[in-house]
């Protein structure tokens, strides 16, 4: 890790209180992290954003990297259909991952993951960029392109954000469906989004219970009217035996087999600031 102290060492648990002990450990940022906080005076920041919102958000946007800058921060000519950063070109995956992987931050931790069984995985920005690029190439090899929709129905694994970022990398629109949703809920979201590819796991663990995610996907896809899904990518999480389909209208693939020979280099799609990034369905709450 680039810093003298690792990211893990910066997470210091506070002294347990009776309330905290009953629920969860509370982590207090180190004094170094607090000193480097981006907002030192919340009230002053809020007043500045209210007084001059366009200038405020332009200042925030200047913290990102753009292929082309905007001609107008906010276009209000067709309310309520506002347009932000008119004419600007960017890619959120580049800003979230690539620009860090190209600097000394490539060795800093991007993710610290802990499973339900307390197993851990650590992934640096450099490693994350490599995995995102490889999966982006996997998607492209299956015909996914800019503007296409991809449904992601997975457990809480690192491959979930990798899939999301890979979609953003190539301009595909991802739709994350909560892994606890039913067959009917998943089917409805696939139909509505018109996804042609689903990314899932063989299974997931929630509160000690195994969830048959792959079986739920299978049940959602074999329906009348048929869904537009042509390909399913399965990440091996639980090790449970699942049926892999190879039919004229649908083919299933193992994540690890596709990733094995995928190139770690992938060109980033240039996106308009108003291009859609994802589709997120409310459950009605």
What role is predicted for each listed range?
Residues 48-71, 88-110:
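A short N-terminal helical cap/helix-turn-helix that marks the beginning
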Residues 19-44:
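Short, contiguous pre-domain boundary segments
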Residues 118, 279-285:
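Conserved adenylation A10 loop of the ANL superfamily
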Residues 67-89, 156:
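Active-site diphosphate/adenylate-binding microenvironment
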Residues 93-94, 107-165, 182, 186-187, ...:
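Conserved AMP-binding/adenylate-forming core of the ANL superfamily
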Residues 150, 171, 285:
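Conserved G/P- and acidic residue-centered "switch" motifs that form tight phosphate/ATP-binding loops
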Residues 107-109, 230-235, 246-281:
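Conserved pre-ATP/AMP-binding loop-to-beta segment of ANL
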Residues 165, 169-257:
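Structural core segment of the AMP-binding/adenylate-forming
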